[in-house]
């Protein structure tokens, strides 16, 4: 097959290229109990107090965990419009108390391979593809010879990866070190 023409899209990154990332702190968050064909079960009840990083739901099939991004009070668990599909799915509604109370430990420690993999699993990290495969499963009982860190933006308007690399460089490098430790043989 011979390449006959290259389609090049106009780059519009200048619209956000120099803009710092800003935090949008919502009054409410809605955490869907459905994603990638996985149904989640809430670990909370209405009026429960939630801290940032606290487990709020667990997957039925994969045991993947979902955590709260804010601290506050659970105000409802009912059907809301799910942006990915347009369908109504059960969601946990949490009213933000703006206190940022957290159960997350921000320690910079050197972890062993198995502990890093366990932390990935407990963090509920899944793949961004359609299957939502638990990331920790990719590291268990496997060795790798190469790590590719892809910092390229795939859209002509998007600069979020670029801005993260500029603004959170140390965290990115630390994360790469942890992944390298997790994949070592």
Name each model-derived stretch:
Residues 15-20, 53, 78-82:
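Intrinsically disordered, low-complexity boundary segments flanking structured domains
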Residues 40-49, 53:
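Short histidine-centered loop motifs in beta-beta connectors
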Residues 49, 55, 71-73:
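Residue-level marker of beta-strand positions
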Residues 54, 58-63:
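N-terminal alpha-helical targeting/anchoring segments
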